């Protein structure tokens, strides 16, 4: 019984010693992150889709901050993200990537042909924003509100039952330009 207590004490002391060494090393050799990169990374949508040409949002944020990369390459974030980054960096807003985009491309969303889906879950594993729901050997479906149209779920599908389709433009999904709607202000008199 005495040997067990000695072993427990020895392991505890070793754990305490290594913990203290790791704690000291983490403070002594800490790497300070660039606060601008952190702020840009917080603005980006974290979809990790790779449409900007970088493997994720963090490398794109580093490229913007350190290498002077264009701020208009985030397709899922669109114009709203580009404007926030421009405001943060005090630079001029740029047209969305595509040099001189005249027409904004239609928003694409993944659609699964559920009759051909075998429930392999490869699309679920590939989706960076968890927009696909389903279970093993069960039908899968896409939550269109979450889908960024990044196309990463199409190639892994063994039955090729996933396709990207444009989102139908409805009054709910249409981008309203409220500044072009004529509004007449009618003065109201208050009577006491």
From Swiss-Prot:
It holds the Pfam family FeS. [4Fe-4S] cluster 3 binds at residues 127, 147, 150, 153. GO terms for biological process: electron transport chain. It is an enzyme of class 7 (translocase). Residues 108-137, 138-167 form the 4Fe-4S ferredoxin-type domain. [4Fe-4S] cluster 1 binds at residues 49, 52, 57, 74. Its EC number is 7.-.-.-. InterPro entries: 4Fe-4S_dom (IPR007202), 4Fe4S_Fe-S-bd (IPR017896), 4Fe4S_Fe_S_CS (IPR017900), 4Fe4S_Ferredoxin_RnfB (IPR050395), Elect_transpt_cplx_RnfB/RsxB (IPR010207), RnfB/RsxB_Proteobac (IPR016463). Residues 32-91 form the 4Fe-4S domain. Binds 3 [4Fe-4S] clusters. Keywords: 4Fe-4S, Cell inner membrane, Cell membrane, Electron transport, Iron, Iron-sulfur, Membrane, Metal-binding, Repeat, Translocase, Transport. The keyword Kinase does not apply. GO terms for molecular function: 4 iron, 4 sulfur cluster binding; electron transfer activity; metal ion binding. [4Fe-4S] cluster 2 binds at residues 117, 120, 123, 157. Residues 1-26 are annotated as: Hydrophobic. GO terms for cellular component: oxidoreductase complex; plasma membrane protein complex. Transmembrane segments: none annotated. Its cofactor is [4Fe-4S] cluster. It is found in: Cell inner membrane. Part of a membrane-bound complex that couples electron transfer with translocation of ions across the membrane. Required to maintain the reduced state of SoxR. Probably transfers electron from NAD(P)H to SoxR. The complex is composed of six subunits: RsxA, RsxB, RsxC, RsxD, RsxE and RsxG. This is Ion-translocating oxidoreductase complex subunit B. It comes from Escherichia coli (strain K12).
């Amino acid at each position: 019984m005495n040997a067990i207590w000695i072993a427990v004490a020895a392991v505890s002391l070793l754990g305490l010693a290594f913990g203290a060494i790791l704690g000291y090393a983490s403070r002594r050799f800490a790497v300070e992150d660039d606060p601008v990169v952190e702020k840009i990374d917080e603005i980006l949508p974290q979809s990790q889709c790779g449409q900007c040409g970088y493997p994720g949002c963090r490398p794109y944020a580093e490229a913007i901050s350190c290498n002077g990369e264009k701020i208009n390459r985030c397709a899922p974030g669109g114009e709203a993200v580009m404007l926030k980054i421009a405001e943060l960096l005090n630079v001029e807003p740029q047209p969305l990537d595509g040099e001189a985009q005249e027409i904004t491309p239609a928003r694409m969303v993944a659609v699964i042909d559920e009759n051909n889906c075998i429930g392999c879950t490869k699309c679920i594993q590939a989706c960076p924003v968890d927009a696909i729901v389903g279970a093993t050997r069960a039908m899968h479906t896409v939550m269109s509100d979450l889908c960024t149209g990044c196309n990463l779920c199409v190639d892994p599908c063994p039955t090729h039952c996933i396709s990207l389709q444009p989102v139908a433009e409805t009054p709910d999904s249409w981008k309203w330009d409220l500044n072009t709607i004529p509004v007449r202000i009618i003065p109201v008199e208050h009577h006491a």
